[in-house]
């Protein structure tokens, strides 16, 4: 990328970017929520679109001069609808959390009841955690996974819903390696008169590629991030398979008298002006580019390889004696329970960092350690697959991770990390990130 001007004008920021570029090029990214965008996406995000304010929506802006940003947003919406087969989409949320906030605020009042997957069982902060707005503004109850299988027990979800009677049920996760039975969740939601929201931030790319169950026919609302397995810029999005009249009875005045607003109108108003002002048009342009890329046949090939790599890695970890929560993976990630390895998540994360491998410590179900220590690590294959790595590489990576973890208590661990880091660097340079070079 051309950074000559930045290098001359602000060497400190340039050096930080150059350092991060080298880190991404020469170390292995296994954080499940991270990926690498294309150069085209980065160019769109670094374009003159960043200069334009565009409060409102295409054709209905509060500012003039929006004819070209309107084109970009319309392209993003059109491509997202085609990619996910949805009738409604809003591409303006700044993040997945913003998207979730907009949905919750659009159908709930403070104190209303919600249900979501427990954070320590693989859920997300915005699904009802007590430290998040979702658990502070609303009465939240969490369902979890079975202690023995590590899989969500739908019978227990139904029992909880019938007892708690939530206004909204959330199905989705940030550290759950199995799929979601959206049909079963909808049946439960209908029994208690609840809205159903699917948060597909992690598997969105795999769903778009047709590899995992489609939530659109079953869920009232679907939210996602646009990075992770979608390989777009960091951002959020809200979708609905079908638009419908809002059941809250919100009306709008027309020349023929009041009419009930469609849910799409309510949602658009909740995003802007409800929780946001001006959209990030440079990011929306990047989203449009990423969605266009995801519509190509090569993207499905990529998504298939992501799952193959995850399956191969999980299989090797299991053969090496690791416990994978839920027993395996059906998507791009896995959660390793390290309690039988006498290493906590914090130590494992730090040692692997020294070995050139980036993961994140993560709580496991029924964890007795704090979120700052944890008993597990979360691993994902989306980013390594973008580099072109295949199943044999995934197997090798599992073996290299095992060398570090099993040697954690040895006096030679520093040397082990150094050796593994050299192997990882070689592997990364054999599978380069094209066009990411920055000259220090």
From Swiss-Prot:
Provide the reaction this enzyme catalyses. (6R)-5,10-methylene-5,6,7,8-tetrahydrofolate + glycine + H2O = (6S)-5,6,7,8-tetrahydrofolate + L-serine
**Modified residue annotations for N6-(pyridoxal phosphate)lysine:** 228
EC number(s) given by UniProt: 2.1.2.1
Q: Name one Pfam family in it.
A: SHMT
Q: Where is the signal peptide?
A: none
Which GO biological process annotations does it have?
Answer: glycine biosynthetic process from serine; tetrahydrofolate interconversion
Does Amino-acid biosynthesis count among this protein's keywords? yes
User: What function does the entry list?
Assistant: Catalyzes the reversible interconversion of serine and glycine with tetrahydrofolate (THF) serving as the one-carbon carrier. This reaction serves as the major source of one-carbon groups required for the biosynthesis of purines, thymidylate, methionine, and other important biomolecules. Also exhibits THF-independent aldolase activity toward beta-hydroxyamino acids, producing glycine and aldehydes, via a retro-aldol mechanism.
Which protein are we looking at?
Answer: Serine hydroxymethyltransferase
Protein source organism: Chlorobium luteolum (strain DSM 273 / BCRC 81028 / 2530) (Pelodictyon luteolum)
